[in-house]
């Protein structure tokens, strides 16, 4: 306690000397860019991450993941800290880019499974070699039940990639 009082009362000691990394004001920040998948069009650039988060509704964790790993956001957009020399600046407004992202989110989310741990499977008929692809085990079980088979999801899980027949089908992840 005495040490705290000493530092608080000492006039030349400054407690506000913390340097903020990635300064949110953008004064010392590196520029960030949003390109199309092949990097030929630059849709947006800013020195602040918060602009991408607030303006376009991209979650900060999602933004950082795609920025750091170099993966494509919505399988279409590339975030980068480097300016690509051959990229042309888009003439779209910020509102148009935000609308484009909203439309792509709806389209992309329709193609996703509802549960992140869902397993996409293929059932292959042993006799005809006909393949039936399903986005989840549940839909594969419904298919088997509609074919008058007493199907069970637990048993189907055990048969994935084992080549053990289940009601005339083999089950594989895809």
UniProtKB/Swiss-Prot annotation:
Any one GO CC term of the record: mitochondrion
Keyword terms, alphabetized:
Endonuclease, Hydrolase, Intron homing, Mitochondrion, Nuclease
Keyword Mitochondrion assigned? yes
Q: What is its EC number?
A: 3.1.-.-
Taxonomic superkingdom: Eukaryota
Annotated disulfide bonds: none
The EC class name is: hydrolase
Q: Does the keyword Hydrolase apply?
A: yes
Q: Where in the cell is it found?
A: Mitochondrion
GO MF term list: endonuclease activity
- Name a single GO biological process: intron homing
The record's misc note reads: Encoded within intron 3 of COX1.
Protein function: Mitochondrial DNA endonuclease involved in intron homing.
Q: Which family does it belong to?
A: To endonucleases of group I introns of fungi and phage.
Name listed for the protein in its UniProt record: Probable intron-encoded DNA endonuclease aI3
The upper taxonomy is: Eukaryota, Fungi, Dikarya, Basidiomycota, Ustilaginomycotina
């Amino acid at each position: 306690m005495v040490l705290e009082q000493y530092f608080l009362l000492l006039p030349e000691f400054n407690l506000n000397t913390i340097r903020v990394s990635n300064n949110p004001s953008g004064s010392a920040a590196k520029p960030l860019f949003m390109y199309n998948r092949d990097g030929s069009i630059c849709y947006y650039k800013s020195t602040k991450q918060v602009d991408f988060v607030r303006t376009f509704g991209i979650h900060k964790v999602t933004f950082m993941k795609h920025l750091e790993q170099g993966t494509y956001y919505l399988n279409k957009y590339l975030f980068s800290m480097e300016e690509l020399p051959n990229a042309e600046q888009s003439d779209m407004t910020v509102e148009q880019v935000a609308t484009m992202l909203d439309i792509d989110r709806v389209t992309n989310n329709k193609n996703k499974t509802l549960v992140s741990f869902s397993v996409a499977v293929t059932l292959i008929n042993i006799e005809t070699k006909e393949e039936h692809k399903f986005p989840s085990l549940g839909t594969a079980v419904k298919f088997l039940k509609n074919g008058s088979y007493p199907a069970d999801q637990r048993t189907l899980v055990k048969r994935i990639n084992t080549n053990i027949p289940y009601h005339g089908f083999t089950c594989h992840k895809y």
